[in-house]
Regions:
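Conserved short submotifs of the Hanks-type protein kinase catalytic core
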Residues: 2-15, 19
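Conserved catalytic-loop aspartate of Hanks-type protein kinases
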Residues: 111
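Activation segment signature within eukaryotic-like protein kinase domains
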Residues: 34-35
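A conserved short helix/loop substructure at the end of the activation segment
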Residues: 164-176
C-alpha cells in the first residue's frame, strides 16, 4: 500500500470573512494594513502574469499575527502579454463587470476590481453591490453604481472610487494603488513593503529555471495537468512542445 501525505501550512486566524463578520467594520488603519498585504501578494503574482480571479474574504486567510495569506488559486490563470481571458469565474459580488457581461478581459484588471470590493467591505462591513438576489446583484455590478458612506475618509473614498470603475481602462492600476495617499498614509505599519512588490518581474535565467526536458518521457503527466490549470486555452500537445523547446 502506497500512502501519500499532503502537508499544508496551518493558518490559525482562519478566513478574513469570518474575522470581518465577527468584528464588523475595521478601523481604517487595520483595514489598510490588511489591504496593503493583499495588494503586495497579488502584485507579486501579477509580476509573473498570474491572475487569481476569485479574490474574496473567504479566500484570504489570517495567521496568528493577523498577516494575510492569499489562498485558493483554483481559478487562477496565466495571462501572457497581449492575451485575453474569457472564462467566466469568481463570485458574483466580487466579480468585475466585464466578467459578468461575458466579455474577454484582463485578469489583472478583474483582480483589482475584486480588491476594491474587499477594501469597501473591510471599511464598512457590507458589500457595495448586493441586490438581495443574484439577478439584481448582477445588474448592479454591470452598472457599477454604488454609494460611498460619508464616514469614510476622503483618501479611502477616492481609492475605492478609482478601483471600482466599470470600464477596465478607467480602473486604477496596481502601481498607482500602491502610491495612492491612503496606502502611503499607513506605510509605517509595514515599512518593509514598498515598490519592489510592484513592476515587471526580473528575467529568469536558464540556470534559475533549470535545463529543458530532453524528451516527452521526461515530462511528468501530473505536472503537465497542473500547468494546464494555468494555461487554460493551450492544448497539452502545445505545452509539451514548449517544454521541449530550448528557448
Amino acid at each position: 500500500v502506497i500512502c501519500r501525505y499532503l502537508v499544508l501550512e496551518y493558518v490559525e486566524g482562519g478566513e478574513l470573512f469570518n474575522y470581518v463578520s465577527k468584528y464588523g467594520p475595521l478601523p481604517e488603519s487595520e483595514a489598510v494594513r490588511l489591504f496593503r498585504q493583499i495588494i503586495a501578494g497579488l502584485g507579486y503574482c501579477h509580476r509573473f502574469n498570474i491572475c487569481h480571479r476569485d479574490l474574496k474574504p473567504e479566500n484570504i486567510l489570517l495567521d496568528s499575527q493577523h498577516n494575510v495569506k492569499l489562498a485558493d488559486f483554483g481559478m487562477a490563470a496565466l495571462q501572457p502579454a497581449g492575451h485575453w481571458l474569457k472564462t467566466s469565474c469568481g463570485s458574483p459580488h466580487y466579480a468585475a463587470p466585464e466578467i459578468i457581461q461575458g466579455d474577454k478581459y484582463r485578469g489583472d484588471k478583474a483582480d483589482i476590481w475584486s480588491c476594491g470590493i474587499i477594501l469597501f467591505a473591510l471599511l464598512t462591513g457590507y458589500l457595495p453591490f448586493d441586490g438581495g438576489d443574484l439577478g439584481t446583484t448582477l445588474r448592479l455590478v454591470k452598472k457599477g453604481h454604488f454609494e460611498i458612506p460619508e464616514y469614510l475618509s476622503n483618501e479611502a473614498a477616492d481609492l475605492i472610487s478609482q478601483i471600482l470603475q466599470p470600464r477596465p481602462k478607467d480602473r486604477i492600476n496596481m502601481q498607482h494603488i500602491w502610491l495612492h495617499p491612503l496606502m502611503r498614509k499607513y506605510e509605517y505599519l509595514d515599512p518593509v513593503m514598498s515598490n519592489p512588490f510592484i513592476g515587471p518581474a526580473p528575467p529568469l535565467s536558464v540556470h534559475e529555471c533549470g535545463p529543458p526536458v530532453s524528451s516527452t518521457q521526461d515530462i511528468d503527466l501530473d505536472l503537465l495537468r497542473n500547468l494546464q490549470t494555468l494555461w487554460h486555452d493551450v492544448e497539452a500537445e502545445t505545452l509539451m512542445e514548449r517544454l521541449l523547446s530550448p528557448k
